[in-house]
């Protein structure tokens, strides 16, 4: 018998009790002594209190109601949505946090707590403060003086000065924007059948663009993922500094360890604490005056690193296939990408640039669940990858974020601007919304609509006939509002040059459509200064010059301004012809590319206008073959659009046809309980497509950094071509040759031997010792090591040597020293198996390796090389995870992923008990599971 009290203000969330519990009691029923009724279920254990989930009237009503399966199944994790306001441990022993998380106390003195209600749930506390440091240091005085001193430019430029200003960084602006997440989630507004049809149509659109079911792979190569990280970004809310500050001195092993721990944390339902910061950027003056500044929520490294393993491949395929479907994510603003976009949208007479607002925060769990469903549909079949995706997207929609006053709150809706696939996910949400609106229009009798659309994040551009224009302008706002997205479709134009898409206008220049920023935005690049560094100033002026192409007067202004600076810096702008080649032919000379390096940052405005640098890099790679470029140019400028692929941008409504040859019908491929009827129409045979010509390449361009390019001659490049050396001489995993020689000399002296005697008689025994016992410095505690002489004969003898001399001079580490003997160790192990006296490395048994032929890769100083098989790599990764201290996760061999095996089994078993189907298990999972059970039977300890 115990007293029960509610925990927190919400009596329907958790209650406290004092009944003694043990591990395994979670889920046990709480029974009232008075009437023997079940009043709740034990849920959590605490230090002095235990907690149970109460039986509420809402639960009783739900159990008594007739329920139906959702048409689009719910994919979010059942275990991660609610953290119940309790203290989160958050793996502080596994990541380099500098801030701690504290439990909430009864009284909270801060700003955020007063806003916590339906939209936010307080979870915990940490240290934080509002950053008021802006990336904009002020106006560029040289440009202001130039304008003021010029009678020619002063009346033209002065009205454009100040139209964009640095965003306001203050507490009022912070809460004005962050509270956009504090909106109720409306129920019953979505037409379920139309929504199901929309999701199926988007899947078909992606399939027609080249996506294949099961064709998206998880990537657990930590090196590839690390190379894709933005190292200039911050580590996260609970860390200090940028990623590059932490990783600059990190070894490969430390980077791999962090990746494995991050992936394991996502698998184990671990929550990260995300940043919620004000965005330092240029914004329209009227928004700055209204104190409207955008916030962004970014993922911490302990979530981001592992999350990229399961989202990057889909994202890269999505970028690669831009314009094969109704999206432009990944489009190149040079090389006539926008010309192809413009001409593909010139089928009907009206253009509508839809204006969306508060898109990220308006995304509901329903929409994000649909995005998750689409990703799972195309992901390779594996329960572990599925588990990671489910947990990740549950965390994205129900994010724990650190507010400016130190309160950690959990939101319950909206996408995060700093997660690894924000733009792709937002684009998918908008595609679903457009397909949903089309289905709603069809159900309302609008059968003759003809239209195309393209999306990029929250940017939407529609090309429609007269009837479709009327429906879009009169009905689409309300249709999309049913999904809680806010769009205005009032502005319609009969020329594509009137619309604005991704903060750019379409301009016809020499018969080619090019993207153009507004003039005042180009002036803002010159007006505002991010850095006083000469190279940064040059990059800003160059960026303005590139963006101004097409505005002859603006180009003249920038060139005159650059000439005024030539006495200090000399001439640094490319010629008009070189910039024209960049836009119209996709060709840039090395001098132009060198100038463009570092331009990206100064071209970014509030609507995610595409920067320059990435596009230039892509264009340079494709520019190796002039003939191929000529063919591409001829294709994209011909009178007729290239042969169509079925992409779904066109939403005309003829009768449904059969699916393409070789592809299975997909009417039942999304869900198990699909509905019948004529609501779902086959996008594949309705649409004409947009095909981006990819030039074939006969040669590959060579990228060099700007400074190196200054001295890049044919003779200099031949030096690189002729460079051939032993990789061991430069590989940082090995000790230097001098360190190896010093170790041999010091070890020989310490054991009272000559160097020759040490190498001939003692070193072979030491190699065998390290094979069996590893190179760990923990071995020094033993005081001695054993060597066997005359092995395999009647005179076999065990000899003890002092171990301290072997380690005292081992710099930088014993493992780095012994890597010089990696090949010898492999030979010794192989020969030992042939002779029937196998040398078994300690890591071989500890990691549960089953294949005897892989024993050499369980040796901790054997180095991986290009001849290794996939099995060898798998074994070495598996041994590495077991070697790193503090990790309780296991590596699934094929995926190189650290998992807490027992917790995963428990979660899967619990799901089966709840009626879920038996999980699919990869061969790697079964192998590791079998080895674990075998160790238990044999009594082998971890």
UniProtKB/Swiss-Prot annotation:
InterPro entries on file: DNA/RNA_pol_sf, Peptidase_S1_PA, Peptidase_S1_PA_chymotrypsin, Poty_coat, Potyv_NIa-pro_dom, Rev_trsase/Diguanyl_cyclase, RNA-dir_pol_C, RNA-dir_pol_PSvirus
Site (Cleavage): 108-109, 606-607
Catalytic activity: RNA(n) + a ribonucleoside 5'-triphosphate = RNA(n+1) + diphosphate; Hydrolyzes glutaminyl bonds, and activity is further restricted by preferences for the amino acids in P6 - P1' that vary with the species of potyvirus, e.g. Glu-Xaa-Xaa-Tyr-Xaa-Gln-|-(Ser or Gly) for the enzyme from tobacco etch virus. The natural substrate is the viral polyprotein, but other proteins and oligopeptides containing the appropriate consensus sequence are also cleaved
Low complexity bias spans: 659-669
GO terms of molecular function: cysteine-type peptidase activity; nucleotide binding; RNA binding; RNA-directed RNA polymerase activity
Record's keyword annotation contains Nucleus: no
GO cellular component: viral capsid
Domain RdRp catalytic, residue spans: 349-472
Active-site residues, Swiss-Prot/TrEMBL: 26
EC number: 3.4.22.44, 2.7.7.48
Region of interest: Disordered: 633-678
S-S bonds: none
Domain annotation Peptidase C4: ranges: 1-90
Family affiliation: Belongs to the potyviridae genome polyprotein family.
Protein name: Genome polyprotein
